[in-house]
Amino acid sequence: MAAAVSSVWAKPGAWALEAEEHEAELKQQPSPTNQKSSAEDSSDFPSLAAAATTKTKKKKGQTISLAEFATYGTAKAKPAPQTERLTQAELVALPTGPRERSAEELDRSKLGGGFRSYGGGRYGDESSSSRWGSSRVSEDGERRGGGFNRDREPSRDSGPSRADEDDNWAAAKKPISGNGFERRERGSGGGFFESQSQSKADEVDSWVSTKPSEPRRFVSSNGGGGDRFEKRGSFESLSRNRDSQYGGGGGSESDTWGRRREESGAANGSPPPSGGSRPRLVLQPRTLPVAVVEVVKPESPVLVIVEKPKGANPFGNARPREEVLAEKGQDWKEIDEKLEAEKLKDIAAAMEKPNEKSTGKMGFGLGNGRKDEERIERSWRKSTEHSEEDAQEEEPAVEGAKKEETEDKPAVEEAKKEETEGEQAVEEAKKEETGGEPAVEEAKKEETEDKI
């Protein structure tokens, strides 16, 4: 192949064909790994025919006793997992208390030990004042607390923590008497860890019982109504404490709402209210007359019986035929009998006439029969409401029918005469035919004689 490729006179593209042939040969040669994998695949996933032919080996039965069979189905209790226990030597080697610390470790465990050298001195130059939680330096050089380290002195960091010194350090607090609402100076301390006041809940279980109750002031009313006790609100003691603290000359009543109302009333010209109470409203007298409202008692309700409308009548205002004839003074039975008698007469007359089906002149009887049938149908289709009028109209109709019958009688007689005349003509024709037969026989005889 190399020689063919290296030859100068080889066809262009011959090397590509040789490469394809070589790849096809390599593909046809199965590799040993492929053979192994194919054998494993055939065993794991046999074909349907192989799976049907191969038979699985049956396991031999195991003989057990009846007692074992009875206890075989019961669930056996699983043994509890045995935990690995320490040996006696390991138990003795375990520590029984905290390890004694050295002096260096004690120094390290103090508050702020790991952050002393971070960012320069803690309270040194002013460059550290820009950090969050650091001390603030004012213009006059006085240091004031800021952040979580408010009012913390440098000497506090060198000492041990209060939590390490005493288990219950809150009990060693000294209660400082003072009002909780007093305003503190801006530069004074009082952070989270350096609060100067002690909670009342820590001192006494029920501190409400020790709260001094302020007596009500005995105030005399100027209006002559007698003396009374003045009621104070819960916030008046706070206002009095503020006045005493700041030295207000107006007294505790200068900041109350009652005093302000009195001052506003005096400015408007109205008399001041007595005892700091709300001023009474002075309304303008009524000028319009009072409308008299008359109370009208409702009358007793009148029961109105309303007939329920019946369902819609599909026939409208139509009434039975019997009722209409009874109002007119006529008997409907007599009218029905008359109609039936006329009907029977018409039927009998129609039955007497012959039913002829011939054409031409013989068709008069059919026409008369049709007229009779139409007249009968017309008589039965009349409305029941106008029965009287119909009965009156039927009288001339019956007379006209009788006249038609009388007029039709000569026509029928003429037709019968024509029929008889026709029958005679037919008989004459038959006679003529019979008379011509001997002449034919004579002619036949003459022919036979001539032949002889």
Curated annotation (Swiss-Prot):
Compositional bias (Gly residues): 111-122
Post-translational modifications reported in the UniProt record: Phosphorylated.
Regions of compositional bias (Polar residues) in chain numbering: 28-37
Coiled coil: none
N-acetylalanine modified-residue sites: 2
Chain positions with Phosphoserine modification: 234, 270, 300
Disordered: annotated segments: 20-282, 349-452
Location of the motif Nuclear localization signal 1: 172-179
Name under which the protein is recorded: Eukaryotic translation initiation factor 4B3
Source organism: Arabidopsis thaliana
Gene behind this protein: EIF4B3
